[in-house]
Amino acid sequence: MEDFLGNIDPKTLEELYQSWKINPHSVDEGWQKFFMGFDFALSDTFGQGSTLSDLEFKVIKLIEAYRLRGHLFTKTNPVRARREYKPTLDIENFGLEQKHLKLKFKAGELIGLSNATLSDIIERLNRIYCSSIGVEYMYLREPKLINWIQERVEPTLNHTEFTAKEKKHILYHLIAAVGFEQFIHKKFIGQKRFSLEGLEALIPALDATIEHGAEQGAREFVIGMAHRGRLNVITNIMQKPFNEIFAEFIGESYDDESTLGDVKYHLGYSNTVETDYGKKVRLHLVPNPSHLETVGPVAEGIARARIDDEHSGDVKSLIPIVIHGDAAVAAQGVVYETIQMSRLKGYSTGGTIHIVLNNQVGFTTNYTDARSSTYSTDVAKVTLSPVFHVNADDPEALLHVIRLAVDFRQTFHRDVFIDLLGYRKYGHNEGDEPRFTQPLLYELISKHPNVRDIYTKYLIESKFISSIEAKQMQEQYNDLLEKHFAKAKENPKIKIKHFLPEKWNAYRYSQSSDFEESPQTGVSADIIENVAKLITDIPEGIPLFKKLIKIIDERKKNYNDGKVDWAMAELLAYGTLIYEGHNVRLSGQDSERGTFSHRHSAYSIQGTEEKYYPLQLIPNAKFSVYNSLLSEYGVLGFEYGYSVALPEGLTIWEAQFGDFHNVAQVIIDQYLSSAEDKWGLQSGLVLLLPHGFEGQGPEHSSARIERFLTLAARNNMQIVNATTPANFFHALRRQLKRDFRTPLVVFTPKSILRHPKNVSLVKELENGSFQEVIDDNKVNESAVSRVVFCSGKIYYDLLQRKEELDVDDIALVRIEQLYPFPKSQVDRVLDRYPNTKKWLWIQEEPKNMGAWNFVKEFFDDVPIEVISREASGSPAVGLSKIHSLEQAEIITKVFRPCTCELKNKYCGLQCEEGSKRFERKKQFEYLDNK
C-alpha cells in the first residue's frame, strides 16, 4: 500500500487531536473542521478505545490522496484516454476493502459529509477531484492558500450551477468561436489562420475572465498570446470589426504606403468594451512575433507600467492574461524567467492568469516527446501557483474554473494556471497534413464533434433551449459575418491601428530630418544645483559605508569645482527629468550600484537592509531602480513592454556587460528594431551596454556594435558611443525632448569611467545638446595631414599618444552617434581639413566587427582606410599581454613617423618600400616586422 502521508501516523494524529482539545487554534483549519464535534475518546466503533480508529485514519489518507493526486485521474482529455498513473486511488491501496464501503466514517466531515459511508465519500471525492476538472494545489505550502481552494471546490463539488441565461450566454460565445473559424475556412480556403478549432472554449473563458474580473474590481486587461486562435480572440473578445480582419485576408496594400506591416495573426489591438453589467473595461492584445512565449514578458511589462501609471499601483485594477501553447510553455526558457519575475518587487504585476491551450501536440511533436514533466504547466510549481486542468469540451467546468482563478488572483495577487485540454482540428496550419505524424490521434479527432455542437445538444436535451432557437442563433451570427465580408470587399486596404492609442496619439513618427541635429536639452543651473545637492548631501543620522562616503564626497568636490564624471552626469540626467515630471525606471543586473561600482544610485544604510535613494526625494515624478534577477531575455522583454506603455517616461535596461545582451537577441530583433515597421509601435527604451576592449577576454569586451548597425534602418533606433559625460547626459535627456520615440542603444564605458580626462564641465549640462560628432579643437586646421575618425573608448588611447608626442597635425574626430549616421556633420569635418593626405578609421574591434563595415559606406568622397584588429570569429583574445600588444600596434600605426624618401611626417605606407612591406599585405601584425 502506498503511504501517501508517510510523515503522519496514528500516534501523530492522536497528538493533533489532543492539541486541538486544549486549543482548537493550535491546528490548521482543515484539522479543526475534522475534529470539531468529534469525541474519539468515547468512540469504540472499531474497538480503538481512546485512540483514532485505524480504518478512520485510512479514510483520511484516502481523502488526502484525492486532494494530492486526484488530478492524475480526471476526465480532462476530450479525445483520448489519458496516461495511467500508479498507484491508483483504488481503496485497496489504502488498506480498505469492499466490505468497508457501507460503513460510516466521521472522516467524511473533512469534505463536508457528516457520518457518511465510505461509498458516499468516494463518490463525492470523484466529483470534486476526478471529473472534468483536475486541481493541483497541495504543494502551495501556505495553509491559507490550500484552505481557500478547498473551501471553494469541496462544498460546491467543484461545480457552478449556471442559470438558463448564463447557459445561453456561454452558447452564444461558442457559436461565435466556432462560427468564425468555419466562416474563414470556407471563404479563405487554404490561407493560414492558425485556427482555434478544438479549443474554442477559450472564447467564453476569456469573456468570463473579463466579466467576472470587472465585477472583482478590474478595469483593464492586458493579454499576451501567440498566433493560435488569435484572430478569434481579436474579433470575438477584443471586438475588432470583422470587416477589418477580412480585409487583411483580401487586401494587397496598406493605407499607409510606408508601412511594412506583418501577418494578420501578429497584430495587436486596444479597445474599450462594455461588460454585460454595464462596466467599461480597457482591453489590450499585445502584438507579437512568431517567436513563441516572447510576448509573455512584454505583456507583463506593459501591465506593470499601466499599474504604476494609470492605476497608482493598484494591482486589482488590471489583470494580465498570458495565453500559452502546451509545447511552448513546457520548453521555452523565457517562460521560466518571466514566472520568476512574478513575485519580485520590481516586476510583479499582482498575479497573472495563465491559460495553456493544450492541443497535445507541438507542430508535429507528440506531447510525450515535448516534455519530461507530467504536465506542460509544471513550471507553475516554481512560484507555488495553483493549476486547474480542464476539459475543453466542458465549457461550464471551464467557466467555473475561470471564476476561481480570477478570485484567487484578486485575493492573493499571485499567478494561477489553467491547463485547457483540447485538440487541434487541423495541422500546425490549415495547409498542413497532421496524419503524416499523428494518424491515430487525427482518426479520433476527425470523428469528434465540436464543443458548440456538444453544448448545444446538452442544452436542448436539458430543455434550456430549443433546436430552432439554437439554429437561429447560428444563422444570425453567420449573417453578421456575411455583411462584414461584403464591407471588406468594398475597401480592402489594410490599416494598422495604434496599439495603446491613448498613450501614443500625441506622438508622431520620426523623419530623417529629425536626426540631422539634436534638440536643445540643457537644464538651468538652479535645477542642476538642486539635484546635485540631493545626490551629494548625506542626511544626518544615516550611517553609510566609508568607501561610499568617499565616493559621494569626491562627487561633491568635483561638482563644486565645476566638473562632473560619467556617473554624476547620468544621475543628473535622471534627476532633471524627474524634476520636469518624467518618471525614470532603470533595471538590470547590479544596476543600483553599477557593475563597475560607479553609479551608486542607492545608498545602503549600515547595519540595516534599508537603502536610501536620493533621486526619490524629487517630488515631481518617480525614480525606480531595480537590481534584476539574473535574466536578460525576460527582463529586456519586460522593460521593452514598460517603455511601450509609458512613452512619457524614461525606461532603461542595463546589461551587466554588453556582451550578454545577445541572450535577449530575440527581443532586440523581433521588437526593439522592427516593431515600428511591423506594427507601427514606437518605443523610447534605452539600452546601456558596457563595451570596450581591456584585456578581459572574449566574453567581457564587446557589446557587438556591428549587430546593432546591421539592424539599423529607416531610423528605427539611435546607436550612440559617447565619450563625454555631458554628451551622455544630453543623449539621455534627448529621449524625452522630442514628439516621437525611438530606441536608444548606448555603448557605455568601463575602464574610462574614472579616467581623469573623461569629465565634463557643469556648464556643458546647462547649455547645448547632444553632439553627434565631436571634432578636434586642438589642431591647426590647415596643417592637418591626417584625420582619424573613431568612436568610443579608443579615443582616449589615441589622445594619450597624441599628447605624449605633442602632435597638432593629426585630428581626432569622434563619431558619437553611429546611427542615424551624421553624414552632413561628417561632411563638414571633411571640408574643414583641405590639406589632409590620410583619412583613417580606427577601432579596437576586429575588422569584421565594430562600426567599420557600416561607416565606410558614408565616406564615399575620401579614400578612408581602417586600422583595427584582424578579422576574427571571436571578439577578443584571452591573454591580457597579447591584448596590450594588439592595442599598442593599433595606436602606433596612427602615429608612426615616416623614414622613407617621401619625407612624410607620418608613415602612410604609400612609398614603394612601404607598399611591399609585410605589414602592408598583412596589416594586422601586432609587432613590428623589421
Model-derived features with residue positions:
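Cofactor-binding active-site loop characterized by glycine-rich and histidine/acidic residues
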Residues: 219-384, 388, 596-649
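Active-site cores of enzymes that catalyze phosphoryl transfer or operate on phosphate-rich substrates
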Residues: 158-180, 251-300, 304-311, 614, ...
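Extended, charge-enriched "interface" segments that sit outside catalytic cores
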Residues: 34, 38-202, 218
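Subset of Sec-pathway N-terminal targeting signals
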Residues: 1-38
